[in-house]
């Protein structure tokens, strides 16, 4: 059974607006590695459309090598999209239908290691359903003072156990957690 890995960039004050953090070469390399290792990506409509607009090929040759690596990884990946408003998707994507929990369980039942989950609203719903197996928060040494926060509206606390950490020259730190019940 595949794990569901949720990873998100977050500022010190909890903002997850991608424009509030500095996407350094080392962070793009880390993200590319995570994406390339995933069996598939799982997005809600907003994140899917944002990522497609930013990373669908063709890519600019002016991008740094690490950014090109990230762009290639996300462009080539198989994707699942949870949406009640889209009628169809492309870009190596399948539109999920029916009950969210059932659809995600079917994805997790597939072969492989893990499925990457991105975004803000969809991961909150998945956390509420107890479907996320691992969380990675890439915490940036920045205070945004505004913006969306992860897990707004979560119906219960998440009790997590730290399983790993990695720090970069920029001062950003990736911290990985699993739900305490599965630690």
Please tell me what each predicted stretch does.
Residues 1-183:
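Enzymes that bind and transform nitrogen-containing heteroaromatic metabolites
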